[in-house]
Structures are given as structure tokens and as C-alpha cells.
């Protein structure tokens, strides 16, 4: 039996994993099936953390000033520090975008945020994805204080891999045992 012939229904796969009576001795099982099951379990566990962090981030971007001042969540308190990082990094660009938004409030604004790349000693270039995502979160938070509809800017400017690195950073910092 190959992994392509296996039933991909999530609940059935998890039932198979947790119901030890239907699992044969692992020594005789096809290693690709075992790998497929292990990958599925790891993705499921990882997805639950990732979706929780994204939910916290989305909630943070929609919070008003009173809610932010009264929060006890350490993750949200950290997110609040990203605004100053964005101001330091983007400077006048923040003011220019806010001016455009005030000037034409009903228009959809395309906001492209730049990344500074650093040259390594091996003559290659790199961008620290965690720091970039922090600055974008701060930028979006500033925009949302004016009008809370600009969360799309985060997802338009940040690649999946960069967001994944940021989620890993938050998981490591706050969810490690």
C-alpha cells in the first residue's frame, strides 16, 4: 500500500494513529506510510499553534486603545512594541501613507513596504524575516489606529516563509515548556 492509495480523510488518518488495535507491527509497515502519518500529525500540531498565533495577531490589529492598555497578554504587549520599530524603520513613509489615506479615505490603497537587505561576508544577501515581519506588524498597527481595515497590508507584504519564521519565533518565545 502506498501513501497515494491511503485515505486522505483527516479524521480517519487520526483515528488510525490513535487506534492501536488496527495498526500492525510497525516493523512490517511500509516506511512511506509511517512517514506520511508522522508528517500529517506534525502538520496538524503545528497548524494549531500557527492558527492561534495568527488569531492573536488579527485580534491585536483590531483592538482599540482601551483594550490595548488593559491587556494582560504578553504576546500582545510585545506586538505593541513593534509600532516604534516601524516608525524608526520606515520614518516619513508612515506619514506619507497616512496623508494619502486621509486625503482619499474611500480609495483602496496599495501599500508596498520595502525590505533592507544586508550583504553577508560571503557576498550574498539576506533579510532577517522575523525583524521584517515585526516592522510590518507595527506599520499595520499604526494604519489600523486610523481606520481598522488595513490588515490586508500585512498579508500583501509578507511572504508565507517570512510569516512562518515569525510564528516559529513566537512559539519558541512563548510556548516552549
Curated annotation (Swiss-Prot):
Keywords: Early protein, Host nucleus, Host-virus interaction, Inhibition of host innate immune response by virus, Inhibition of host IRF3 by virus, Inhibition of host RLR pathway by virus, Viral immunoevasion. It comes from Monkeypox virus. One of its GO terms (cellular component) is host cell nucleus. This is Protein OPG036. It is found in: Host nucleus. The keyword Hydrolase does not apply. The gene is OPG036. Belongs to the poxviridae OPG036 family. Induction: Expressed in the early phase of the viral replicative cycle. Plays a role in the inhibition of host innate immune response. Within the host nucleus, inhibits activation of interferon-beta promoter by inhibiting IRF3 activation. Its main location: host cell. GO terms for biological process: symbiont-mediated suppression of host cytoplasmic pattern recognition receptor signaling pathway via inhibition of IRF3 activity. The keyword Chloroplast does not apply.
Amino acid at each position: 500500500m502506498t501513501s497515494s492509495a491511503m485515505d486522505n480523510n483527516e479524521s480517519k488518518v487520526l483515528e488510525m494513529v490513535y487506534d492501536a488495535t488496527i495498526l500492525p507491527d510497525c516493523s512490517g509497515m511500509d516506511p512511506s506510510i509511517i512517514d506520511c502519518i508522522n508528517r500529517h500529525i506534525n502538520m496538524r500540531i503545528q497548524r494549531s499553534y500557527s492558527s492561534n498565533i495568527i488569531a492573536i495577531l488579527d485580534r491585536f490589529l483590531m483592538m482599540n486603545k482601551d483594550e490595548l492598555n488593559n491587556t494582560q497578554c504578553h504576546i500582545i504587549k510585545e506586538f505593541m512594541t513593534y509600532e516604534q520599530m516601524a516608525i524608526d524603520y520606515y520614518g516619513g513613509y508612515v506619514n506619507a501613507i497616512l496623508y494619502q489615506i486621509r486625503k482619499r479615505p474611500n480609495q483602496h490603497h496599495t501599500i508596498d513596504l520595502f525590505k533592507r537587505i544586508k550583504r553577508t561576508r560571503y557576498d550574498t544577501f539576506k533579510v532577517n524575516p522575523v525583524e521584517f515581519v515585526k516592522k510590518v506588524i507595527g506599520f499595520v498597527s499604526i494604519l489600523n489606529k486610523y481606520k481598522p481595515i488595513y490588515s490586508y497590508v500585512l498579508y500583501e507584504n509578507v511572504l508565507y516563509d517570512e510569516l512562518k519564521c515569525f510564528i516559529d519565533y513566537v512559539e519558541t518565545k512563548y510556548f516552549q515548556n
